Amino acid sequence: MADMARLRQVEDAWSAMEAAGIASEVVPVTYMNSSADIKAFCGRNGGAVCTSSNAETALEWAYQQGSKVLFLPDQHLGRNTAVLKMGLSLDDCVVWDPHRPNGGLTTEQLRDAKMILWKGHCSVHGRFSEETIPELRAAIPGVQIIVHPECKHEVVLGADLVGSTEFIIQTVEAAPTGSAWAVGTELNLVKRLAADHPDKRIVFLDKTVCYCSTMNRIDLPHFVWAMESLVEGVVVNQIEVDEETEKWAKVALDRMLALPGKTHKD
């Protein structure tokens, strides 16, 4: 997902907003799943970082700063939060496609929009289909559908509950014995919930198996190697960014941490 919003692309989009005369009204908000330079871009331009837990709070703050929001890189989290939590309509939202001239939008569309969504998505959550929901309801009487807000808007509308990873875990854990759940999020989490709660029926929402290849890069052998290296005083695979990027990315992150309520849990 982070690779779907490159700094040069975002800067080009910002230039188009400046040309349309709206950049001064736009507050950029980036999902935590983004690169350091995109976070720094938001910090430099009066914006902030958010997680799936605090996206609503972050947008409330952003709309106090300006009349429009550029939300990146996950269009689905931005759309679901704007429409279902903030009271915006789908017509208030436009999608900026970095691979099309002027994002595929007219100047009028940019000026009319309240939410400018970046055309990016999670490769796992984007696979879930609203067509699966009635099939599961028919196959498992009384099943509750719970999904992550990175899912498509149509999937979220068909679900019973929508919330962050933390919300999904807490909801399923607190559910009564014998309850049935179809969960729309990363498969490893669903399998872990099912293993930890054998008294409940917990199934994956998708028909096919789709692991998050990015998360699966963190495997046990490499984790052990990294930890053992630290014990020996050796730092391996250290990620470094330049001071300017670090400075402005931290500004955006600090703005998030200063928001009220739960602001740092996903």
Where does each model-flagged region fall?
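Active-site loop-to-helix "anion-binding N-cap" substructures in soluble metabolic enzymes
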Residues: 1-147, 151-183, 190-266
